[in-house]
């Protein structure tokens, strides 16, 4: 763990191959703890972790809460409905309140892009010993989801020893609303870092052509890419072409709440063209796993029958793997906290 240099986890674009290896190794260990009878480690005993979710969440917030408790941390959950935001307090003042209370790690989800990054910059400038963990910001990033998806796939391809090598030269297809998906962006960084070839598929309104260059250059303000050679990214408009020879398929929810008018004609047409079903999976020419980060819109991006077919979909595995993955991140951020 001596190679871990991050005081915050904001975006997977900054992760080196060693960072991915560290997280996958720790996640494997913590998964055994999560499944054991004791289910707890004293690693973060006495540390305060605050979950500040300014957007609705079920899986991610609960997963972070359980992860923190598995590490014996004290946990404080923020609720918008019962907060002083209703009295006119700004989100920044709410967050600063938790910092003043001595929170060691703030897990933050916000509808606006870069809120976690701006907060990380604030605590660094003011020499505050608090780490920021991005639990999803706007369209930008959802690093813990990208990492748990990476672990889920690595475990599927190599159950005995999941690692970054488990993804090397694998063909992963991501289908759906790429434009509005922070999950897709985080998966692009993670999968290509580990040598996977990623094919994106969706209508032009939800998958602009510029996504083909998404991982070619670091984000604004980042001087270099810590990955020497990434896997390739392709765009296919035809689902049949995209699924050909795929080793795994991820389908994404249509984020209607983020869409402008007329971005889609109708949901029935979308399902016919891009819905993942048992029939469309035959284009892969072999049995492949299907992932979905949730929440699922049955009969829109994935068939009801496929959602309930646990011999093919890894949806429950993704939820299960979320806890040890987030344990790994919290543990790494909590390692160097001063008493």
Swiss-Prot record:
Biological or metabolic pathway of the protein: Pyrimidine metabolism; UMP biosynthesis via de novo pathway; (S)-dihydroorotate from bicarbonate: step 2/3
Swiss-Prot/TrEMBL GO biological process terms: 'de novo' pyrimidine nucleobase biosynthetic process; 'de novo' UMP biosynthetic process; amino acid metabolic process
Sequence positions that bind L-aspartate: 87, 182, 253
MF annotations from Gene Ontology: amino acid binding; aspartate carbamoyltransferase activity
InterPro entries noted in UniProt: Asp/Orn_carbamoyltranf_P-bd (IPR006132), Asp/Orn_carbamoylTrfase (IPR006130), Asp/Orn_carbamoylTrfase_sf (IPR036901), Asp_carbamoyltransf (IPR002082), Asp_carbamoyltransf_Asp/Orn-bd (IPR006131)
Pfam families to which the protein is assigned, alphabetical: OTCace (PF00185), OTCace_N (PF02729)
Keywords, ordered alphabetically: Pyrimidine biosynthesis, Transferase
Positions contributing to carbamoyl phosphate binding: 59-60, 109, 142, 145, 294-295
Top-level taxon of origin: Bacteria
Coiled coil feature spans: none
KW Cell membrane (keyword) present: no
Cellular component terms (Gene Ontology): cytosol
PANTHER family: ASPARTATE CARBAMOYLTRANSFERASE (PTHR45753:SF6), ORNITHINE CARBAMOYLTRANSFERASE, MITOCHONDRIAL (PTHR45753)
Role summary: Catalyzes the condensation of carbamoyl phosphate and aspartate to form carbamoyl aspartate and inorganic phosphate, the committed step in the de novo pyrimidine nucleotide biosynthesis pathway.
Family, similarity comment: Belongs to the aspartate/ornithine carbamoyltransferase superfamily. ATCase family.
Complex formation: Heterododecamer (2C3:3R2) of six catalytic PyrB chains organized as two trimers (C3), and six regulatory PyrI chains organized as three dimers (R2).
HAMAP family: Asp_carb_tr
Designated name of the protein: Aspartate carbamoyltransferase catalytic subunit
Gene label: pyrB
């Amino acid at each position: 763990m001596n190679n871990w240099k991050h005081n915050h986890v904001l975006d997977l674009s900054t992760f080196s191959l060693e960072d991915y290896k560290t997280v996958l190794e720790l996640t494997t260990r913590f998964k055994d703890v999560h499944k054991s009878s004791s289910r707890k480690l004293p690693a973060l005993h006495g540390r305060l972790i605050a979950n500040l979710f300014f957007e609705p969440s079920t899986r991610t917030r609960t997963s972070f809460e359980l992860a923190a408790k598995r590490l014996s941390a004290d946990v404080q959950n923020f609720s918008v409905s019962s907060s002083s935001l209703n009295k006119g307090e700004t989100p920044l003042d709410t967050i600063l309140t938790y910092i003043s209370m001595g929170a060691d790690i703030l897990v933050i989800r916000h509808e606006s892009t870069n809120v976690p990054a701006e907060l990380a910059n604030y605590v660094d400038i003011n020499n505050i010993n608090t780490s920021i963990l991005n639990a999803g910001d706007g369209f930008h990033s959802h690093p813990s989801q990208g990492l748990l998806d990476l672990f889920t796939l690595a475990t599927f391809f190599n159950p005995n020893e999941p690692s970054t090598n488990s993804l090397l030269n694998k063909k992963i297809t991501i289908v759906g609303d790429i434009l509005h998906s922070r999950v897709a962006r985080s998966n692009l960084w993670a999968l290509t870092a580990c040598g996977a070839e990623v094919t994106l598929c969706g209508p032009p309104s939800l998958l602009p052509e510029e996504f083909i260059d998404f991982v070619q250059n670091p984000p604004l303000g980042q001087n270099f890419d810590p990955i020497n050679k990434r896997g390739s990214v392709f765009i296919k408009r035809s689902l049949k072409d995209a699924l050909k020879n795929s080793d795994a398929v991820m389908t994404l929810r249509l984020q209607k709440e983020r869409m402008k008018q007329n971005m889609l004609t109708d949901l029935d047409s979308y399902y016919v063209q891009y819905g993942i079903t048992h029939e469309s999976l035959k284009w892969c020419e072999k049995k492949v796993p299907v992932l979905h980060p949730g929440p699922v819109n049955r009969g829109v991006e994935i068939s009801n029958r496929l959602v309930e077919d646990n011999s093919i979909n890894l949806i429950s595995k993704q939820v299960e793997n979320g806890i040890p993955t987030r344990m790994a991140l919290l543990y790494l951020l909590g390692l160097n906290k001063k008493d």
